[in-house]
Structure formats: structure tokens, C-alpha cells
């Protein structure tokens, strides 16, 4: 990645690389740290083997993410790298990490990544640094340097940080702090900058995007933000983490009225049964699930719906799970992510009785996946014979174009794989939109033939 910046301080001797674990919100933190170190004169490497310092930006949302984070920390300390641990694990387990892995040179909390250059300076002087605020309060704006990989043509745009909800299963409010939104002007400014860099799609993220602005404007202001962003020359704007309570008439109208806001609704509903939702401390949601899904389908027939679900939550009975399967069959989501409940110490759900056995939880997850695969396959096959607009992102080993239509979000959904005449120079298509004829579909991906560059 070796970036060159004319407005940097004196060149540092250390070479720094990053290892990233976790969600796209964590990825934005990593990109800001990369930008800050580059500005401060550090050589930021894409190859960890070439670096003497490794910043591991960790995730602590569920047990498997923590295990992956620890594996990476130990891998790099065993290689003799100077390791700095950033992110949610640093926030969650600062004392334990320094005690159990004394090779760690520094910790950087979720609200402290803007201090990364000073942390490295102190580490290089031999200090063991613990830079973790008790309550995270910082959120980066467009003035904080950020490295964005333009080769991917997609960028995440964080509109708020933290969360004021207290879902029983979720540790995030304790790790990320209370909600703090950026101003509309700040977000639009960054979106314009990304457009100038050639980004073709921005994805708005926060813990709850539909609560955006409530802390600074006195009420949720996502609709107003979308109306302003619709004026920015970005072909696709996608919204993740929308909650049913915030999908007001104004927000849905903004989706309908804006040409570049794609009708893709990412709704982390978690469950359908009122009893389970009450145990999850989301009692308000049960009465809204049905009505909001029906409203979206009615108002925007082309809408694509994605949700994430938790199975095996304490107290989830057979009838609760059957209710969930019926819910999936009735509403036929385009995409579903399903997770087995992970008991997190410090959450209300950690001590709940009536635990579901791991075997039953795993079987329920497999059942959801099986049901959804059939639904997704039917959904995808409905596109066969149609022409679609595709953003081409890379070339396969078989010299096919790989991209996405608006109904596929990056990383979590499927791809569109396109054949093309051998006489064409394939790299000319990377980062461009093409028109394609869809000729085949399976439960995950679409396949077709390229017609022309749009």
C-alpha cells in the first residue's frame, strides 16, 4: 500500500501493517488509523512480512471473533513483531490482554484510534501503552485522514457511532459507547470526496442507521440525510442496519424519490416470535415486523430485503422456532444471515435460564439455512431472462467478469458472474457498470453474458 503524502512529518523508520478482524465499522477505524500513520510519516505496508509493527484491529462481538483476534495477536507476537491491539477486544479486555499476553506493546480503544500515531511514538520509546478511554466518545469526520482502497470501488461511510439501545444479547453499547452522529454537512462532504476518488458505491453504516441524528438534531434525521446525499454524484448509495422503528414514511419516500439510493433494506430483525423478542429486550419489534415488511413491498415493489437472525436464544422453544420458519416462508427475504446465540459476559442474556443446547441450536441454524436457500434460489431465478445493471469489480481465474447488481451487497450476498467475448480487454471493464443478460441462477449467484458498458 506504501502511500506517499506530501503533507507528512519527517519519515519514520518503523514500517507498520494492519490486521483487521470484524465488521465494516471496524474496517473504517482501520482505514482511519492507516491514514493517520501515513500522514505522520510512517510507512504503512500492505504486506505484514515487511513490517516490524503490526496493529491488530480486533472484534469482540462473539466468541469466534475473539478467538480469531487472539490467534492473530499470537501469530504476530510469535514472529517477533511489535503488536498493538486496537478495537473492541482492547476496549473489552484491556487488563486481561496485557496480563495474559505480555508481549503486547500497546492497546488502543474504540474511541481512541485517532491517537494511533502518538501510541506508536510511545511504543517506539519502549513504553507499554494503554490508551483506552472508559467511555468511547470520539467519532471521526471528513477531516481525519483515511485510506480507502479505490480498487474496490466501494466505500463504507459511517454516519454515527455507538448505540443507546440495550438489546439483551449485545455487548456493543459497552464497547462503542453511546450514539454520536456526524452532521449532515460532514457526511455529505465525505461522500463528495469519495465520489471524486472514483468510488461507485457508498454504504451508510452505524449501529442503527435509522436512529441517525437523534442525538444532535433531537429526532431521527435519516430521511433528510438521504435527500442531501441523493444530490452527490455516486451511482449507488446503500443503507445497512435499518431498524423497523425508524423506517418512517419519510425514509421510505426518500428511497422512492432518489435515483441513486438503491432499494435494498438491511433489517437485523433477529427473531419473529414476541416471546423471544421480549427476552431479547426488543418487545416493540414484534408488532412492527409484519407491517413494515408489507409496507416496503407495497411502496417499493423492486425492494430487496435482507435480515439477520439469532437461533438458540435462551428460552427459544420449538414453537418459537417454528414461528420463525413460518415467518421466513411468508415474507421470503432475498438474503438471510443466521447466527447461533453467543452468551456474552456483561450482557443481560448471559445469565438467562433455559439455555438451548448447542446441538439443538446448530440444527436450527442448519434448518434456517436450508429453508432460505430454497427461497433465495427462487428469488434469483426470477431474474433469469432479464437485463440487469452490474458493477464489475474483478476478473475470475476463468476470465469472467465478477460483479454485483444492486440486490447484492458486497461481502455478505452473492455475485454476478459474466462471460464476455475473448476479443475484449477485460481490465477495461473493472470499476464500470455494464448491462448484462442473466441466463442462469443458483441460490447464491447470478450468471449471464455482458452486453455493453453503460
From Swiss-Prot:
Reaction it catalyzes:
L-aspartate(89)-[ribosomal protein uS12]-hydrogen + (sulfur carrier)-SH + AH2 + 2 S-adenosyl-L-methionine = 3-methylsulfanyl-L-aspartate(89)-[ribosomal protein uS12]-hydrogen + (sulfur carrier)-H + 5'-deoxyadenosine + L-methionine + A + S-adenosyl-L-homocysteine + 2 H(+)
A GO BP annotation:
tRNA modification
Recorded GO CC terms: cytosol
Q: Does the keyword Iron-sulfur apply?
A: yes
Top-rank taxon of the source lineage equals Bacteria
Keyword Repeat present in the record's keywords: the answer is no
Q: Which cofactor does it need?
A: [4Fe-4S] cluster
Q: Where is the MTTase N-terminal domain?
A: 14-125
Keywords on this record? 4Fe-4S, Cytoplasm, Iron, Iron-sulfur, Metal-binding, S-adenosyl-L-methionine, Transferase
Q: What is this protein's record name?
A: Ribosomal protein uS12 methylthiotransferase RimO
Q: What does the UniProt entry say about where the protein is found?
A: Cytoplasm
One Pfam match, given by its short name, reads TRAM_2
Recorded E.C. number(s)?
2.8.4.4
Amino acid at each position: 500500500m506504501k502511500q506517499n503524502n506530501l503533507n507528512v512529518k519527517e519519515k519514520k523508520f518503523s514500517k507498520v501493517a494492519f490486521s483487521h478482524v470484524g465488521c465494516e465499522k471496524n474496517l473504517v477505524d482501520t482505514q482511519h488509523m492507516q491514514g493517520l500513520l501515513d500522514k505522520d510519516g510512517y510507512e504503512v505496508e500492505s504486506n505484514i512480512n515487511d513490517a516490524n509493527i503490526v496493529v491488530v484491529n480486533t472484534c469482540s462481538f462473539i466468541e469466534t471473533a475473539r478467538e480469531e483476534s487472539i490467534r492473530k495477536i499470537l501469530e504476530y507476537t510469535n514472529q517477533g513483531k511489535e503488536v498493538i491491539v486496537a478495537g473492541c477486544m482492547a476496549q473489552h479486555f484491556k487488563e486481561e490482554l496485557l496480563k495474559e499476553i505480555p508481549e503486547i506493546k500497546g492497546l488502543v480503544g474504540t474511541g481512541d484510534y485517532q491517537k494511533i500515531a502518538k501510541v506508536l511514538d510511545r511504543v517506539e520509546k519502549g513504553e507499554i501503552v494503554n490508551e483506552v478511554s472508559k467511555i468511547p466518545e470520539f467519532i471521526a469526520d471528513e477531516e481525519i485522514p483515511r485510506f480507502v482502497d479505490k480498487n474496490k470501488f466501494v466505500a463504507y461511510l459511517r454516519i454515527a457511532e455507538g448505540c443507546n439501545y440495550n438489546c439483551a444479547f449485545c455487548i456493543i453499547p459497552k464497547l462503542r459507547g453511546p450514539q454520536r452522529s456526524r452532521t449532515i454537512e460532514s457526511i455529505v462532504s465525505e461522500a463528495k470526496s469519495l465520489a471524486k476518488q472514483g468510488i461507485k458505491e457508498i454504504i451508510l453504516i452505524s449501529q442503527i442507521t435509522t436512529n441517525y441524528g437523534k442525538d444532535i438534531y433531537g429526532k431521527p434525521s435519516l430521511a433528510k440525510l438521504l435527500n442531501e446525499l441523493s444530490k452527490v454524484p455516486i451511482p449507488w448509495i446503500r443503507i445497512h442496519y435499518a431498524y423497523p422503528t425508524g423506517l418512517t414514511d419519510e425514509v421510505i419516500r426518500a428511497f422512492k424519490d432518489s435515483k441513486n439510493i438503491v432499494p435494498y433494506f438491511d433489517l437485523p430483525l433477529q427473531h419473529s416470535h414476541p416471546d423471544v423478542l421480549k427476552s431479547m429486550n426488543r418487545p416493540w419489534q414484534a408488532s412492527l415486523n409484519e407491517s413494515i415488511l408489507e409496507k416496503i413491498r407495497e411502496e417499493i415493489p423492486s425492494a430487496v430485503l435482507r435480515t439477520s437472525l439469532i437461533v438458540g436464544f435462551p428460552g427459544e422453544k420449538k414453537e418459537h422456532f417454528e414461528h420463525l420458519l413460518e415467518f421466513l416462508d411468508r415474507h421470503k427475504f432475498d438474503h438471510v444471515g443466521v447466527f447461533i446465540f453467543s452468551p456474552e459476559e456483561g450482557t443481560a442474556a448471559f445469565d438467562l435460564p433455559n439455555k438451548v443446547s448447542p446441538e439443538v441450536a446448530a440444527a436450527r441454524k442448519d434448518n434456517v439455512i436450508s429453508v432460505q436457500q430454497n427461497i433465495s434460489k427462487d428469488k434469483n431465478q426470477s431474474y433469469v431472462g432479464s437485463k440487469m445493471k452490474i458493477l464489475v469489480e474483478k476478473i475470475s481465474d476463468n476470465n469472467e467478469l465478477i460483479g454485483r447488481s444492486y440486490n447484492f451487497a458486497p461481502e455478505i450476498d452473492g455475485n454476478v458472474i459474466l462471460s464476455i467475448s475473448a476479443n475484449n480487454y477485460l481490465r477495461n471493464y473493472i470499476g464500470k457498470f455494464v448491462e448484462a443478460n442473466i441466463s442462469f441462477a443458483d441460490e447464491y449467484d447470478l450468471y449471464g453474458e455482458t452486453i455493453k458498458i453503460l
